[in-house]
């Protein structure tokens, strides 16, 4: 081998070593970045668990429970339970929960897409969210770390704040909000009534409750926004949500991954879960650690009973696999009903029949409007009907029911005409 060839080979080896070294360090950096990303995702997951545990601790406070009990018309709900035929196949305690759900949704709490203007008290298309406001000391005292800011087009852009309270006692006073406020207040009521209840958090931005049925020996889904009882596939098969993690929280029962109850664990769902936390074992360990911490002060007999119940629930969730007949039945579940059509549409929660949902509402509206307005065809009456119809749809988009919207639309337009 001549000297030049030796130098060339030496240079080639050196270049190859440098290339291999660069590749090695690049792989190390990529692994480190991946580890950092996984650690970051795990930290975010843990933060959500911590936050939910802080929320449920308030349900065990004696003052909070006393305030909650003072709000519930127990005797009246007992009477309704006895006279209701819709839930006659259920046991007494479960029937009471059904009546509590109806009362909570229709009489106690009020849904809020947008707050009423602080000046004119109107809400709807006049109110526009313009961002977030800085929470006041009072807001922070009642857990409102987020405060939405709205302005009213009818009042020279007058501004109104909407604090998102997370204090369950404060919510008994305000009685308004969205799914977070609904689930928080309703779970407190169940605990005050001595039901075993779990606060359930969905990682795609919804919250609801589960109640332990002594009569059925299982956890039952309760959504106080929809007055829905024992319809766990409502979100995946009704609303069309693509769920990932669904976790239930209770001071005694601990922290439980109940995702299988709410959506079939297929490949798509597994992929969505991995996008949140890559390591499923991490989730199992985290929920177990929190559960053990929450149960630490319980007597051994109670801990043993809960461990047995855990094992039964694990088996129940493992065996859940919807047959085609069950899937067909669940496809009849409705899309989301609470909130304005515009708001539900923006969240993609109208369900699998989203295209026909608006047509159905229009058909219902036409029936209501025909009963509310005149059917004669004079020009003046036709113009009046057009005005009332426009007002009707404005009110419907604010989440008001067809019958109420029709009555208010006719009244509003005639009032305006009377002032002209």
What are these model-predicted stretches?
Residues 209-214:
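Active-site beta-strand termini and strand-to-loop segments that position acidic
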Residues 2-174, 178-181, 201, 216-420:
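Alpha-helical and coiled-coil interaction segments, frequently adjacent to or embedded
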Residues 187:
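Cysteine-dependent deubiquitinase/ubiquitin-like isopeptidase catalytic cores across multiple families
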Residues 206-208, 229:
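Flexible loop/turn segments at secondary-structure boundaries
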Residues 191-205:
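Short, well-structured beta-strand/strand-turn elements
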Residues 105, 109, 190-195:
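Hydrophobic/aromatic-lined pockets within catalytic cores
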């Amino acid at each position: 081998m001549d000297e030049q060839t030796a130098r060339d080979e030496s240079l080639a080896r050196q270049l190859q070593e440098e290339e291999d070294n660069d590749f090695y360090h690049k792989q190390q950096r990529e692994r480190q970045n991946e580890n950092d990303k996984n650690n970051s995702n795990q930290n975010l997951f843990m933060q959500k668990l911590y936050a939910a545990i802080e929320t449920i601790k308030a349900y065990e406070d004696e003052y909070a429970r006393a305030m909650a009990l003072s709000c519930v018309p127990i005797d009246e709900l007992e009477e309704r339970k006895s006279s209701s035929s819709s839930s006659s196949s259920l046991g007494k305690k479960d029937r009471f929960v059904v009546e509590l759900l109806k009362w909570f949704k229709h009489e106690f709490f009020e849904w809020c897409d947008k707050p009423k203007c602080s000046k004119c008290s109107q809400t709807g298309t006049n109110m526009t969210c313009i961002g977030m406001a800085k929470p006041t000391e009072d807001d922070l005292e009642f857990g409102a770390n987020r405060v939405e800011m709205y302005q009213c087009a009818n009042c020279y852009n007058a501004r109104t704040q909407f604090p998102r309270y997370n204090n369950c006692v404060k919510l008994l006073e305000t009685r308004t909000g969205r799914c977070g406020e609904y689930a928080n207040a309703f779970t407190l009521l169940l605990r005050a009534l001595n039901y075993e209840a779990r606060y359930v958090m969905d990682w795609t931005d919804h919250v609801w409750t589960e109640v332990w049925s002594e009569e059925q020996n299982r956890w039952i889904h309760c959504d106080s926004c929809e007055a829905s009882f024992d319809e766990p596939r409502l979100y995946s098969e009704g609303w069309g949500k693509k769920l990932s993690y669904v976790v239930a929280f209770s001071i005694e029962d601990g922290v439980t991954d109940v995702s299988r109850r709410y959506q079939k664990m297929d490949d798509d769902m597994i992929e969505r879960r991995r996008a949140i936390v890559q390591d499923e074992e991490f989730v199992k360990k985290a929920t177990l650690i929190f559960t053990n911490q929450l149960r630490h002060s319980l007597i051994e007999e109670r801990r043993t009973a809960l461990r047995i119940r855990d094992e039964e629930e694990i088996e129940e969730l493992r065996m859940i696999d919807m047959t085609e007949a069950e899937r067909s039945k669940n496809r009849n579940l409705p899309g989301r009903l609470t909130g304005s059509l515009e708001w539900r549409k923006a969240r993609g929660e109208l369900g699998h029949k989203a295209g026909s949902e608006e047509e159905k509402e229009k058909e219902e509206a036409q029936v209501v409007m025909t009963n509310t307005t005149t059917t004669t065809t004079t020009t003046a009456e036709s113009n009046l009907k057009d005005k009332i119809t426009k007002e009707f749809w404005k009110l419907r988009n604010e989440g008001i029911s067809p019958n109420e919207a029709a009555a208010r639309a006719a009244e509003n337009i005639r009032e305006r005409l009377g002032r002209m």
